[in-house]
Amino acid sequence: DMKTGLKMAGAKGLKVDGIAIDTWGVDFGLIDKDGNLLGNPVCYRDARTKGMPEEVFKQIDPSAHYAINGTQVMEINTLFQLYSMKKANSPQLEKAAHLLFTPDLFSYYLTGEANNEYTIASTSELLNATTKDWDWETIDQLGLPRHIFGKIVMPGTVRGKLRRDIAEETGLGEVDVIAVGSHDTASAVAAVPATEDEYPMAFISSGTWSLLGVEIEKPILTEEARKAEFTNEGGIGGRITFLQNITGLWIMQRLMAEWKENGEEQQFDIILPQAEEAHINAIIPVDDAAFQNPASMQQAIIDYCATHQLQVPQTKAEIVRCVLQSLAAKYAEATAHLNEMLPQPIKCMHIIGGGSQNQLLNRLTSEALGVPVIAGPIEATGMGNILTQALAKGEIKDIDELRAVVRQSI
């Protein structure tokens, strides 16, 4: 598919100055010494990591671990995926020469260069948040093979040239393949239209997941941050995105898909105004395991409310209202924890990504947080990707100028 798109650009005679890839975090492929992929990558929602955090923390101290990598412990993290493979004596892990996160793998196919981009590596729970290099202590303690962890490349740099055969096949010639914020959240946060004096700059990257946090200069590696379940992820310009991963619009997406499958399809422009008028006194914990991947999301919500003495939603509008006000309540809880760890409380909240189009959720969030909400851009990830390519090419000076371009463009 990537080559098809590049061929289309070549056929139109377009001059391509750069190519860059960003994706979701934590997932990876393993390649052998000959560059062959050792089996298809496994989705982070796979059950193989079940119980792995408990296994890992029998061997390493969680507080000391957080003080090094500053990562929110989540069962889906690369650390636990790799440890599950080690426990299972995976032949793929034994034969692996390189670990490549999803965007690293695609970049490898385009360039032949096997390296690991900083922001995507920071989702693994295997990166030292201070040195921005691998957390060799944890890697060694768990007996993971050192040699699979490659050179870290920073966003805003060239990670390789388009392979000659692909350059000829697509008609594009020599093109730089650029390291951007390969973790889509990092690219999205780069495109937050904040001003230089807006510190700390607070954001919610709103999609399937909601990533709520601030951009800071140095990681926060305190016990308070660990207990509050915040993570230090890599950002553009060497900055840190200090955030919490929250189940976002996943619940809404599942509801809409379920209703469609049952012949009860709903349109957002119809159901959201109905939810605006609905009233229900129920707040559900959106991160609860009950809502991770149930057979029926609607039934999971109804059952949770019934078994926890909450008002049970009777209509689709009440279900949607319950979900959105619960999300806003979770945002408020996370922001309260965040403010306790910052030198001053946040003054406004930027909501970016597809979820920024949900005006009801934006309003509920503003009310719950008690601060103004600034919505957009919707395509923050794409904008951040492209403008970081411009940064690598010297067309943009720094992250502040990048954000000025965003402000002038929306």
Task: Say what each PLM segment does.
Residues 1-39, 67, 95, 167-177, ...:
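N-terminal glycine/serine-rich phosphate-binding loop of ATP-dependent small-molecule kinases
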Residues 7-43, 72-76, 107-128, 151-154:
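Short beta-strand-loop/turn "lid" adjacent to the catalytic site in phosphate-handling enzymes
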Residues 13-23, 98-99, 151-152, 341-353:
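Short glycine-rich phosphate-binding loop at a beta-alpha junction
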Residues 46:
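Carbohydrate-associated surface elements
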Residues 50, 57-70, 74-75, 80-113, ...:
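Active-site core segments that coordinate phosphate-bearing ligands/cofactors
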Residues 66-67, 117-120, 146:
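Short beta-strands and strand-loop turn motifs
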Residues 130-131, 155-159:
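Short beta-strand to alpha-helix junction loop
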Residues 142-155, 386:
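A conserved helix-loop-beta module that forms one wall/lid of the active-site cleft
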